[in-house]
Structures are given as C-alpha cells and as structure tokens.
Design a protein with these regions (language model features):
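A conserved structural/catalytic subdomain of Rossmann-like adenosyl-cofactor enzymes
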Residues: 1-183
Length: 183
C-alpha cells in the first residue's frame, strides 16, 4: 500500500512541465525517513531538489494537524537536463557493473561448483541451501551496486540543495500571527 503523499508527489512531478517548479508541504517523515529513500530517489531522478525547509512542530496545530511538516521545492529537469542525467546515470551503472562483474561471476562459479556435486548425490537440502546462499549474495550485490552507482551519479551530476530548519513561520500553534523568517 502506497501512502497518499507519495502518490501525490509522483502525480505532481508527472504533471509538471519540463523546467517547471513545484513547492509542496509534506509530512517530515516522507523526505527524511531512511525507509522511504526511494521517494527521494524518485524525485532526484526527475527534478532538481532546490530546497527542503523543516517547519516547527506547531505550524499546523491551529488547523488540527499534529504532524511535523516540511516544504519541498523542486524544479523538473528540462528535456536536455533529463537526457544528460539519464546518460550519466547509465554510465555510472555501467561502470559499477563492470567493477563488480568479475567478483560476482567468481562467486557464482564457486557456488555452482558446490551445487553440481550435491545434485549428483541427490542431496536436495544442500542444493537448496547453496541456491539460497546464491540468491542472497546476488541480492546483496545488486543493492551494493545500486548504492554505489547512485553515489557516483551524485558526484557526476552535482547541484546544491538548500536545507533549513525554520523556527518562526508567521503563525503560532494557536493560529495567531508571528514573525516569519521564510522570506
């Protein structure tokens, strides 16, 4: 089940024209929760993240909302920027794949040399055990390659992201006007 906020981000980015800008209020956990890293990556793959501004806990208390919120500002890639990003992304993935392929092939071969004799001896438990080990290894290596490729892409497609923790946003927890440091 996908959270509504995540679907909303996806739809907003899909509807945004190339080069278009978007400002959106999100629950804070959506963009800074490690388990939702795929949301950040989804945005990074389509737009420049210009700024993330964390709002005080009480910002929306007067409206009945108790969740801490953030402002997310993005600018969708132009067609040229999107093409450049995809080219650099493909190059980063290819470089990381080439780096790890000999290691992965060697481990597959090693595990296959354990599977073949076990099959001949009809030791199905050992076959299943080694096949499980192989699948686990391949999954771990795929995750490692994805992390390293994303890091390499960030080095090759760098841009600044403004991060700010706001304390005064023009409204108090009771709904009264307050000073505002956001402009």
């Amino acid at each position: 089940k996908v959270k509504t906020e995540i679907l909303f981000i996806e739809r907003c980015l899909a509807l945004l024209r190339p080069g278009g800008r978007l400002g959106i209020v999100l629950p804070e956990g959506i963009f800074n929760n490690p388990s939702l890293a795929y949301v950040r990556e989804f945005c990074e793959d389509r737009a420049f993240i210009k700024a993330v501004v964390s709002l005080p806990q009480e910002t929306f208390n007067s409206a009945g909302a108790t969740v801490k919120a953030s402002l997310l500002f993005v600018q969708k890639f132009s067609d040229e920027e999107a093409a450049d990003y995809r080219t650099k992304q493909a190059a980063a993935r290819a470089e990381i794949d080439a780096k790890y392929q000999p290691i992965i092939d060697a481990e597959r071969e090693r595990l296959q040399t354990e599977i073949d004799p076990a099959r001949k001896l009809k030791n199905l438990d050992r076959v299943k055990e080694v096949q499980l080990e192989l699948r686990k290894y391949e999954r771990q290596m795929a995750e490692l390659k994805a992390r390293e490729a994303r890091q390499l892409l960030k080095e090759r497609f760098p841009y600044p992201i403004f991060l700010y923790e706001a304390e005064h946003v023009g409204i108090t927890g009771t709904g009264q006007q307050d000073s505002c440091e956001l402009y």
